[in-house]
Swiss-Prot record:
Species of provenance: Shigella flexneri
Alphabetical list of Pfam families matching this protein: NUDIX (PF00293)
Enzyme class: hydrolase
InterPro entries on file: NUDIX_hydrolase-like_dom_sf, NUDIX_hydrolase_dom, NUDIX_hydrolase_YfcD_pred
Protein family: Belongs to the Nudix hydrolase family.
The protein's name: Uncharacterized Nudix hydrolase YfcD
GO molecular function: hydrolase activity, acting on acid anhydrides; metal ion binding
Keyword Hydrolase listed: yes
Organism superkingdom: Bacteria
Membrane spanning residue stretches: none
Keywords carried by this UniProt record: Hydrolase, Magnesium, Metal-binding
Named cofactor requirement(s): Mg(2+)
Length: 180
């Protein structure tokens, strides 16, 4: 019985302030002790200004029932960031075979969470196959609609979305300058 429990345990890398791996722990231990770890954040958008928003199930171990402005999740031990992002997008939403853009990393910390986030984005129009034990529903919202309802969203996903929007605005400005 103990061997089966250990085999089903999800292991994650624990990292320091510089995002260097210093240990491994079970996901359960990481949550209980608020250990610093890595996660992926994927902004799924339609390419026309709308963001796919998820409603977290009430059984999630972190911020159940809240809205998420990004897909993604905890990076498993020894897993590459892009590999994790692709795995999470496919598991949560059924998104596979689409290009992912990388937007760098960021740090987020509050009383519930200490995480180094890897930010990605992709364009998808569905249909979406929701992972029933993690995602209870999805809808499309504009960034302005998300901002107006910010108290309903996970704070780490809002930080990821704000960073994506800021980096996207810079890319659009560079493209505009180049075109002139």
């Amino acid at each position: 019985m103990e061997q089966r429990r250990l085999a089903s345990t999800e292991w994650v890398d624990i990292v320091n302030e510089e995002n260097e791996v210093i240990a491994q722990a079970s996901r359960e231990q990481m949550r209980a002790q608020c250990l610093r770890h890595r996660a992926t954040y994927i902004v799924v958008h339609d390419g026309m200004g709308k963001i796919l928003v998820q409603r977290r199930t009430e059984t999630k171990d972190f911020l159940p029932g809240m809205l998420d402005a990004t897909a993604g999740g905890v990076v498993q031990a020894d897993e590459q960031l892009l590999e994790s992002a692709r795995r999470e997008a496919e598991e949560e939403l059924g998104i596979a075979g689409v290009p992912f853009a990388e937007h760098g990393q960021f740090y987020f910390e509050d009383k519930n969470c200490r995480v180094w986030g890897a930010l990605f984005s992709c364009v998808s129009h569905g249909p979406f196959a929701l992972q029933e034990d993690e995602v209870s529903g999805v809808c499309w919202l504009t960034p302005e609609e998300i901002t107006a309802r910010c108290d309903e969203f996970t704070p780490d996903s809002l930080k990821a979305l704000a960073l994506w929007m800021k980096r996207n605005a810079k890319n659009e400005a560079v493209e505009t300058e180049t075109a002139e």
